[in-house]
Amino acid sequence: MLLKEIIREELEEDYYNYYNNLGEYSTGKGDDIKEITNNSQNKTNNNNNITILTSYNYNNNNNNNNNNNNNNNNNNNNNNNNNNNNNNNNNNNNNLFVSHSSILRSSSSPSSSESDEYSNGNNNNNSIINDLSSSSSSSSSSSSSSSSSITSPSSNHAYSPYNRSHKGIKISPNNKQVSSSGLLGSTMVSTSLIMGASNINNNNNNNNNNNNNNNNNNNNNNNNNNNNNNINIINNSNTNNNSSNSNNTINTFNFNNNLNNLNSINNNLNNYSNNMNINNQHNHQFNHYNNNNNNNNNNNNNNSDNNNIHFSNNGNMNIYNPNLSNFNNNNNNNNNNNNNNNNNNNNSNINNNNNNNKQIGNIVAKDDAEQLKESWKKIKEISNEFIKLSKLATKSDLQSIDLIPELRSKVMDLNNFLHVIEEKGELLKTDERQQKKRMESDKNAEKREKRREASRLLNNVCRNCKTTETPEWRKGPDGTKSLCNACGLHYAKNVKREAAGLHHLNEVGKKVDLTSILN
């Protein structure tokens, strides 16, 4: 125990000297650093005399988060607790841990034999536990909570387990206090903290989602070096929520947490058991790859239920993001519109096919009409040949006997053409073009008939030809409607010639001889 205390003091001094010499942040804005204490946010558990401060910083940047861990990852995390314990001391990213009296353990914490490496067995000491949850979005937070826990049995301050290369942690030279921030459900234990910035993000690409067995090993790596993140906390950059309209800003010096949220979380921490089994299993159902597939493939129309974001800490916190469901609803609407467009296109194709059928029908009708004309022409030719043959037969009785086979062949051809005309005639009865022609001819016939009836009612007679029926009565020498149509046109032409000087009229205005004009 004495050796452990000596090592602890040396490590504490080393930590303090290093972070004290670290100076300002990389931004060069040392004057803007604020030391903030959250004594009002402390929550005491009387059963263990352990002061626990929890603060949550919600970041809904959900596009490519490592939040798609299924319950299978939880089982893998339980199987990989030994690897996590080894990774706590031997991490490729040089994570420094100080482990002393009591360790804040999760529901899947290692056994007592395994925890002897990190704990001195003093679980009843008054201590302050700083649980920096390394994985806020993966389901392996149960193992990472124990791996990232730092206890100090005799001091009132906690040290950060972050990499030395990380410049987002500031230690006050006066109070020797280390501050750090966690994302999405990470618990923090401290009585006086500087709310410095720690570049903690678990927004891994979807490639990390497939590494189920390596999620525990990647948790601490994500705490220190997350190259896949575009969030620069040191520069006070904002992380915009791509799946909602809210602007989730991660500030370097200020947390975006309301006291009401902290109080509700502290109330939830009262329900923890005496063994300090904290269940930080976050069932993050972030199926954003399904959202991307909805953008690329219009066939995924049933992913709207998977877009509810559930942040669960012992099943007491549920956050619903409605914009994701709206996003998928829009995709579904787009898909429906695409389907409607396809239906419209199909309907247009059907209409085009119908038009083509109509055109084909017109072509067939036209061919039938032409075939009828050809057949009638052939019949006319055959009839002319009959006349010729009959003339030859009348000249010589002997030759008529030789013409009988030729006449029979012509009769057979005539019968064939007659059958064709009968068949095509039935088809032409349903042809619209032929019906229109018949209707027009019928209308013209009706007009002509009406004119004839009108002329009969007048009882008029042409003065030249003595006809009583004419399509139109014309002006003559005896006045209007004195000549028929043909006589009236001839009379008008002669009058124009007389006016031109061919036949000069008398100046007295004698009547012109009707016979001379008409002739």
Swiss-Prot record:
| Ranges for region Disordered | 25-182, 198-249, 273-359, 431-453
User: What GO cellular-component annotations does this UniProt entry give?
Assistant: nucleus
Keywords noted in UniProt: Coiled coil, Metal-binding, Zinc, Zinc-finger
Q: In this entry, which stretches build a coiled coil?
A: 429-461
Q: Where are the zinc fingers (GATA-type)?
A: 462-487
Name of one Pfam family that matches: GATA
InterPro entries the record matches: GATA_ZnFinger_Domain (IPR052138), Znf_GATA (IPR000679), Znf_NHR/GATA (IPR013088)
Q: Which SMART domains match?
A: ZnF_GATA
Q: Which cysteines are joined by disulfide bonds?
A: none
GO BP field: regulation of transcription by RNA polymerase II
Q: Where are the transmembrane segments?
A: none
Compositional bias of kind Low complexity: 37-156, 273-357
| Biased composition, class Polar residues, residue ranges | 172-182
Q: What is this protein called?
A: GATA zinc finger domain-containing protein 8
